[in-house]
Amino acid sequence: MSAFDMSHGFFPREPICPFEEKTKIGTMVEDHRSNSYQDSVTFDDVAVEFTPEEWALLDTTQKYLYRDVMLENYMNLASVDFFFCLTSEWEIQPRTKRSSLQQGFLKNQIFTGIQMQTRSYSGWKLCENCGEVFSEQFCLKTHMRAQNGGNTFEGNCYGKDSISVHKEASIGQELSKFNPCGKVFTLTPGLAVHLEILNGRQPYKCKECGKGFKYFASLDNHMGIHIGEKLCEFQECERAITTSSHLKQCVAVHTGKKSEKTKNCGKSFTNFSQLSAHAKTHKGEKSFECKECGRSFRNSSSFNVHIQIHTGIKPHKCTECGKAFTRSTHLTQHVRTHTGIKPYECKECGQAFTQYTGLAIHIRNHTGEKPYQCKECGKAFNRSSTLTQHRRIHTGEKPYECVECGKTFITSSHRSKHLKTHSGER
């Protein structure tokens, strides 16, 4: 066969070759087909990028989720009629801002890169034996060697498996068709899973209960239910944990291990989100402002809790006594007053506490640490609340007023003592 036979439908079929020359990860997809009227969209427009430092902070579950999202972006571009070359294996490195990513390959591992390449397709190459159409001469030659039992390219990045897959596809045994756009693909494991997602299937099945999930990360979280929803090795802990990242944070709280450290003051934190929030204190950033009183906050959680002061909403209620709280953590601490549970014990003297912050403050009595220092006089304290009260000596602020006589006080405890003089209590 020396020319295109349009009656056999060879030309309309999209050429998908697993042997096209690999390009650098994230190469922009710049051209539509010649008859397209839409503006060009690049892979960079939909890509999610990480620096090597940020990538190192992700756990395995988060990396699997990244793979799933990038695959979906990749296939969405394909579905709007882009040409691309699909390799049979995925690069095992994150798509980053400062990395060449010219690394090796591992099968069926975490997907972390997408490779796409623009082609002009000014000239089509036809296999006269089977009618397969190729975009480049290199692909056709590789295809012919595979058909003739020639060089299998052992030692290159694709290997025998890719030759076999391509050979099967070239003789009409397409492994799958992407129905939304009619494209034909030779499947990799990752692509096979993604096609199931696009077709509404849930490829990740729980072996315990049979429930299906679209993403591996969702299945990983679900598995925590079957192992008791509590992976924390500390028996006194009441947290229900279903993910490995939450477990690491919880263990860090109990052991005192803090791996994230700020460059400005050297203070350490158990997780990156706490470090980010603390970094704003050095920059003076307060992004969330209350419209009621003008007070500003560095994070949304503190802002939302503050708003409840104005609204009076206390959604967390104690079933024992009916007392309500603005935060669930405050309710948890309160419940321990009914149960008598004090899970946090000092290893030095054995004194126990209902909350971890109480233990942390108590330990400073043994170590002599006083991290809160007054900028006016240099006096240091082991509690931030004590420093706040001390500052009022310098500012002259007395926010606590007696409703009986109008006298004001620096602390609420001083006002409480004063009120007893009016009531006659001792």
From Swiss-Prot:
Domain KRAB: 41-120
Zinc finger (C2H2-type): 176-198, 204-226, 260-282, 288-310, 316-338, 344-366, 372-394, 400-422
GO molecular function, one term: DNA-binding transcription factor activity, RNA polymerase II-specific
Primary residence: nucleus
Keywords assigned: DNA-binding, Metal-binding, Nucleus, Repeat, Transcription, Transcription regulation, Zinc, Zinc-finger
GO BP term, example: regulation of DNA-templated transcription
Disulphide-bridged cysteine pairs: none
Record flagged with keyword Repeat: yes
Single GO cellular component term: nucleus
Signal peptide positions on this chain: none
Pfam families assigned to the protein according to its UniProt record, in alphabetical order: KRAB, zf-C2H2
Compartments, record wording: Nucleus
SUPFAM superfamilies associated with the record: beta-beta-alpha zinc fingers (SSF57667), KRAB domain (Kruppel-associated box) (SSF109640)
Keyword Coiled coil: no
SMART domains linked: KRAB, ZnF_C2H2
Free-text function comment from the UniProt entry: May be involved in transcriptional regulation.
Record family assignment: Belongs to the krueppel C2H2-type zinc-finger protein family.
The name this protein goes by in its record: Zinc finger protein 562
Annotated source species: Homo sapiens
